[in-house]
Amino acid sequence: MTSTTESYPPIEDRYVSLLWAEAEMAEELALLHAQLFDPAWDANALRDLLADPGASALVAKVRLRELGPPVPVGFAIGRVAADEAEVLTIGVTTPFQRRGIGLKLANGLLRAVATSGAKRLFLEVAKGNAAALGLYHSLGFKEVGRRQGYYKGPDGSSADALTLGLDLTNKP
């Protein structure tokens, strides 16, 4: 079995569902986070985060077979504090990347934080993550800062993070 996108059928909207994540989904989210990020957040950290009244989290699930159960393939977590919000983490597993699922998650999170009264939304993204940068720029995010050496690799390397911001006051 390969992990390329060619191994999977094209994804139609009827096969993708977005669900609001609850604290009870922390184990499931921790497994996804471990596939996507190093270091990964554990279930306890995610459970605590999901219990925060200012947090919003979405899980993307895909139905791979007409009658099969949906499989979690991505998630997004954000948090609102006063009139600002931040995307804490967003990711889609490799076989399902570049298929519109990240955009669905980002748009869902955008709507959630915008309706909560946040005026600006911020996030950090690795400077070299072209796919994520393309997504965020398409949504209107602009670079507002840079954090040198923010991301640490398992081999001791580091990568700069770009801080991106989005004005939510002009969003419908």
Language model: regions and residue ranges:
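Conserved beta-strand edge residues that scaffold enzyme active sites
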Residues: 47, 64, 127-128, 150-151
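Short glycine/proline-centered loop/turn elements that form peptide/ligand docking sites
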Residues: 106, 129-132, 149-155
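Short amphipathic helical patch at the helix-1/turn junction of helix-turn-helix
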Residues: 92, 126-127
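Acetyl-CoA-dependent GNAT
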Residues: 3, 11-99, 103-112, 116, ...
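Conserved catalytic-core motifs of GNAT/GCN5-like acyltransferases
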Residues: 44, 122-124, 137, 142-159
